[in-house]
Every structure is written in C-alpha cells, then in structure tokens.
Amino acid sequence: MRLLRFYPGRNRFVYTWHDCQARSGLRPFHHQMEKKRMATQTVYQFKITLKGIRPPIWRRFQVHSDITFYELHRIIQEVMGWYDGHLHLFELGGMIITDGETLAEVWEDGVDEQRTRLPQFIRQAGQKLRYEYDFGDGWEHELLLEKILPAEAGVHYPRCLKGKRACPPEDCGGVWGYAGLLEAMADKSHSEREMYLEWLGDEVDPEAFDLAEINETLQEM
C-alpha cells in the first residue's frame, strides 16, 4: 500500500511504502530477511559538498551500497534540505546518470538511474562524482565516497552523521542569487530585504543545521 504522509516540521509531503501484511503474520519473515541482508551488506559513506559557497555547506551520510542512483538522489535531497522540485543528474567520468524522461529528451546515451545500482559505477573509496540539482539555478555538488564499511546491526540506513550550514532556499538564483539574498537579509536597511522576507516568510539562518530532524525524515525511507 502506498501512503502519502505530511510532515508539518518540513512543510512537505513524503511518499512511503508499507507492507500491511508485514504488520501481522509476515513480520517475523521480513525481520529474518532483513537480518540476513545485514549480515552480508556493505555501507557506503559519502560526503556531499555544495560547490561555490564559503563557508562550505556539506553533509556526511551512509547508505546501503546496493541502492539505485535514484534512491541516492532521494537521500541527497533529504540530507541537504532540497525539495526535489527540479531536474537533477549525476555525472561520473563523463557518463550522465539521471531519470528516464530526462534521458529521452536530453541525453540519449546516458544511464537510467532507476535501473542502475551504485556498485555498477562506484566501487572504490576516494571516487568522486558530480551531482547537479535544478538546471536553472545550477546547484552543483561534489559527492565523495569516503569509506566502504560493513553494515552495523541495529542501525537504520540511510543515516546522516554530520553536516554544516543550511541549504539555500529553492529558486533563489543559484550561488550568486543566494549571496545577494544573504546580503539583503543581513542589512535591515537594504531595499530588497522586505521583498525577501515576504517571499521566504521568515528570517534566514545560514548556519542552521538540524541533524536530528534529518535523521527523523530518513527513518521513513
């Protein structure tokens, strides 16, 4: 059964999947399968950094190594604080990995992210790839595979370990637009400050980072 949940703290809807049968007689079976998976599973530890902004905005997080690039995209959206309202892509060694619709329209020789698992292209610690979100604003991220680790028993993946600074607001004009926004918000006499306040609905704290809130959302994935 597919359920649509609304999380007031994030002001957004999140799709989650629940197997209703697993809540009854099949729960022990699914629990055993998960234990078996954990026994052989490895974990990828990534550090993602938003490029072009200082001090840097970054997150360190861990995922099961066998997830698809689409699942990685969804996790990145959550740990960074984006709202998944725009196109995106991964680039590794000149290879484009993105959703099937974008491939059909733009990159015919690319790779479908929903049919491609991480180990098909990412196998060694130290590998880097580019993740771009919102082709208009052009938010570019560097994604570094820091470590390959055994999964820990009793730990939910994905999980965020650490991070710094808040994600910029959506549709603010990219790196330069965000710099202008922060400049206006820091100066109460700035001519554009009221416009930004009306648009955003609140003050912007560029240093904000709530690890607990991020992991609470990841628990639903």
Tell where the protein language model's regions lie, with residue ranges.
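Short linear regulatory motifs enriched in tryptophan with gly/pro/ser
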Residues: 13-21, 25-221
